[in-house]
């Protein structure tokens, strides 16, 4: 490269105007990625009823990864917001897709999706989103994001649900009851009555057997480790998250850490429980604490197994 005044890097160029951008001052999720001062970030709804000012101090700042994709909701708002009727939810697997032939670029779906997971393609004039790798799903393969994840953090599985209960669950008056209401929508694949009805409705036995072996059912229903992202949106999201364990936040007196028996107290974790509850259970701390305690107990047990050779 010839000598110049700048480092040989690719400077940002606007896809809208085509001009070079000297300084990027705002972008998607700008506040969430620490792109601005804390005064703006603290407006995040997840900080409701959290002593937010404490986390504005650098030494108390916490980070967590939240890999988000389309939630493929049971009650998708994007479907209802599209004037062209281009968005639909497939009956056979629940995947939400955009018909590119029907899409007219109204962009109502972008503002209609509370998870911000629909994007407008300025070149094609169409809206686009995660398609859950449906061609791979149809051929029995996992999604690309699941297969290529080095940490193996993603789990896929069949989950049976009662479609007749969706409206009732989404209409639950108290936001904190929405998580439990969605659990009631899911069906036990080992229940003989569920199996009988599923076969009558044309569900193949192979799908029922897959549901019985589904890791998703175990994480969400049996162990109750996975929780829905912002259930207060009432979309009944179908991509759930296991809350993250975080380093222990030292108590006021240096060297003292809250303990609950043999495992650390979940209230001593660096990421506030209330913050996670606002994100995953509409502010209800009980399911979050239960999941964190189970994760801490399993970590403690596994540590003793591998290090102390106990059990």
Residues of each region from the PLM?
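Non-ligating segments of multi-cofactor redox enzymes
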Residues: 1-311
């Amino acid at each position: 490269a010839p000598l110049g005044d700048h480092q040989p890097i690719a400077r940002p160029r606007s896809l809208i105007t085509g001009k070079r951008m000297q300084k990027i001052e705002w972008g998607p999720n700008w506040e969430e990625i620490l792109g601005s001062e804390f005064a703006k970030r603290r407006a995040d709804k997840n900080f409701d009823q959290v002593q937010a000012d404490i986390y504005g101090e650098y030494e108390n700042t916490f980070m967590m990864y939240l890999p988000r994709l389309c939630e493929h909701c049971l009650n998708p708002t994007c479907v209802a917001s599209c004037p062209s009727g281009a968005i639909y939810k497939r009956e056979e697997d629940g995947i939400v897709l955009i018909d590119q032939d029907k899409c007219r670029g109204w962009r109502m779906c972008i503002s209609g999706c509370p998870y911000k997971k629909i994007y407008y393609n300025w070149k094609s004039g169409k809206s686009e989103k995660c398609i859950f790798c449906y061609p791979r799903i149809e051929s029995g393969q996992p999604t690309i994001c699941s297969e290529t994840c080095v940490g193996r953090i993603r789990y896929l599985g069949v989950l049976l649900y009662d479609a007749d209960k969706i409206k009732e669950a989404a209409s639950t008056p108290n936001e904190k009851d929405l998580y439990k209401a969605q659990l009631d929508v899911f069906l036990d694949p080992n229940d003989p009555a569920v199996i009988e009805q599923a076969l009558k409705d044309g569900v193949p036995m192979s799908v029922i057997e897959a549901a019985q072996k589904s890791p998703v059912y175990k994480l969400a229903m049996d162990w109750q480790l996975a929780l829905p992202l912002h259930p207060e949106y009432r979309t009944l999201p179908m991509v759930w998250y296991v809350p993250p364990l975080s380093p222990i936040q030292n108590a006021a007196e240096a060297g003292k850490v809250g303990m609950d028996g043999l495992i650390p107290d979940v209230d001593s974790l660096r990421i506030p429980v209330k913050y996670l509850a606002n994100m995953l259970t509409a502010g209800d701390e009980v399911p979050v604490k239960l999941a964190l305690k189970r994760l801490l107990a399993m970590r403690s047990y596994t540590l003793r197994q591998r290090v102390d050779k106990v059990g």
